[in-house]
Every structure is written in C-alpha cells, then in structure tokens.
Amino acid sequence: MVSTDSIRQSIQAGLACERVDVVGDGQHFQAVIVSSAFEGRARVARHQLVYAALGDRMREEIHALSMQTLTPAEFALRQHG
C-alpha cells in the first residue's frame, strides 16, 4: 500500500517545494503542493511537473491523486485571505 509520506517524499525529491501536504486512504490521495516552480505556469503545466516528479508511481501505484498546486504567494493569500 502506498503511504502519504512516500508520495510526499517522491514529490519533494523531484520538485523544489516550500510545502507538500498529502492525505489519503492508500489508493486515493489529495495533495496541496506549494512551489516557486509553479510561477507563471498554467494549472495543467503545474500538474505535469508533479506527475514528472512521481514518475512511474503515478501509473503503477497511485490510483487517484487530486492536487492543489500553488505558488508561495497564492498559498499565502489562501492562508490570510
């Protein structure tokens, strides 16, 4: 079974992140990912960066992953907005 910690570690290993929060039940996961690498990128491009960081795990181990991909400024607005 895939753990939330292993998903978080895989994302952090492949993408410079300020914050990665992952919750899930072993098959379906939700993640909030905050990275400066998302600056100036559309949502699809941001998700592609995360998929690249997860590599084969996305096809082989993770059945469903919903993501919120935010820049540090976007995350700060959500926290204080």
Language-model regions, residue ranges each:
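N-terminal first-folded block
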Residues: 1-27
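Solvent-exposed beta-strand sheet faces enriched in polar/charged residues
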Residues: 23, 32-34, 68-70
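Residue-level signature for short turns and capping positions that connect secondary-structure elements
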Residues: 27, 36-38, 72
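Histidine-centered active-site/metal-ligand motif
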Residues: 28, 47, 63
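A short acidic, often aromatic-flanked loop/helix-cap motif at beta-alpha or helix-coil junctions
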Residues: 28-30, 75-76
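A short interface-forming secondary-structure element
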Residues: 33-45
